[in-house]
Amino acid sequence: MKYTATDKTAKEKTKSKNIKTRVKPGYHLSLGIVVTMLSVIVLIPLASVLVYSLKISPGDFVALIMKENVRNAFITSITSSFIAAIVNVVFGLIVAWTLVKYDFPGKWLLDGLIELPFALPTAVAGITLSKLYSGTGFFGKGLGKLGIDVAYTQAGIVVALVFVGIPFVIRAVQPVLEKMDNTYEEAAYMLGATPSKTFFKVILPELRPALLTGFGLAFARGIGEYGSVIYISGNSARHRTQVVSYVIMQKLSYIDYASATAIALVMLVISFLLLLFVNIVQVKQSQRTNLL
């Protein structure tokens, strides 16, 4: 029986695959640990939110979400998170660009300070921001003379969400800028393109997936933020400065777990759909970029 070159190649690939499988010991154990940890840390808690929220009938669920204070809290959280995410994308890109493209004294310190919102307790951030932007604060006093109130308004919520969300954008964009090939940028300059045209036509398309990722993470973080917001927002239903996380804490303080988990479920679905949309757009954008 004769063997063709194709048969020989197939046998070599099968042999190589078998060897590769054998040199990876502990596969089933590792997979079991990963699945168990994900289940305990992520899946079971998320499933419990769904289970508790099902204790409310569909009619009561809709009535709860449509209550004026709950509805306004969702509107405030979503709009504030969206505005803050847009601001974070703009300023996060500028900071990441500065850190990657330029050398200056204290660069290492600035790069390290970016991680501060991650490490700083959110309650401490909220107290600090509320003091700075209050009527007697360092920033609030000057803004007050211009007739601009930040503390205990929706603007204060946006400021807090910008503070906690900007590291997501910077850390998403910075590695892409560091690995970006400068050949296309230099070619654009040689062909007579202006710096602004080079940025928008050559550089920005490469950064778009990272910017979308940073936007999605900052937005999702903003919707669920609690500690840094409650101290600067005022938490007033009449002035529409309550956020969803504060309403959930109110329900929990009243031992109303079903209502709290129902509201949390809606917030969870919104965040999941947003991140899913961002990931889909990111994948399509990456595929389109690779085809160019």
Name each model-derived stretch.
Residues 20, 58-66, 71, 106-107, ...:
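Membrane-interfacial helix termini and adjacent extracytoplasmic/periplasmic loops
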Residues 2-3, 22-25, 29-33, 44, ...:
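C-terminal transmembrane helix and the adjacent membrane-cytosol boundary/short C-terminal tail
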Residues 148-189, 215, 276, 280:
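Membrane-cytosol interface at the C-terminal ends of specific transmembrane alpha-helices
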Residues 22-26, 61, 68, 226-279:
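Interhelical loop and adjacent transmembrane-helix boundary motif
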Residues 40, 75, 79-91, 95, ...:
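Hydrophobic alpha-helical transmembrane segments of multipass integral membrane proteins
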Residues 20-24, 28, 49-86, 101-102, ...:
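Periplasmic/extracellular loop-to-transmembrane helix junction in inner-membrane transport proteins
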Residues 32-36, 116, 163-165, 169-181, ...:
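Transmembrane alpha-helices
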Residues 18-22, 83-114, 127, 131, ...:
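Transmembrane-helix boundary motif in ABC transporter permease subunits
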